[in-house]
Amino acid sequence: MNKNHLSKRVRLLKINEFFFVFQKPQRIKVHSMTLFSRSNKLNFPRIGLAISKKYIKHSHERNRIKRHVRETFRTHKHNLLSLDFILTVHSKQILSLTNNNLIEELKKLWYHYQNYQQKS
């Protein structure tokens, strides 16, 4: 297996893991996306995605967004705190972003948590 893949242990997969984050989250909003986070008792960050058909009708667009979220998370996870993250989309405006712009917006989200880590 490729060592650069995103393993199952760093993904939120069960409904109770999502509910845990949504109970008392910290929130950050950037260009039609919201990143919810909550600390976990593990020694690594985890990511969950909640991207609904309500805002993004076509599956290929949802998959494009998910692919970029997972990839940017994978490249930044070593610098992040032990938090559970859930990314949601709250506007159709995200469809107007090019791949490069989307990646830049996602990097801003992860950068915030890298700064947050250094301040703590």
Swiss-Prot record:
InterPro entries in alphabetical order: Ribosomal_Su5_D2-typ_SF, Ribsml_uS5_D2-typ_fold_subgr, RNase_P
Any one Gene Ontology molecular-function term assigned to this protein's record: tRNA binding
Keywords: Endonuclease, Hydrolase, Nuclease, RNA-binding, tRNA processing
EC number(s) on file: 3.1.26.5
A Pfam cross-reference name: Ribonuclease_P
Similarity comment: family membership: Belongs to the RnpA family.
Stated role: RNaseP catalyzes the removal of the 5'-leader sequence from pre-tRNA to produce the mature 5'-terminus. It can also cleave other RNA substrates such as 4.5S RNA. The protein component plays an auxiliary but essential role in vivo by binding to the 5'-leader sequence and broadening the substrate specificity of the ribozyme.
UniProt protein name: Ribonuclease P protein component
Native source organism of the sequence: Blochmanniella floridana
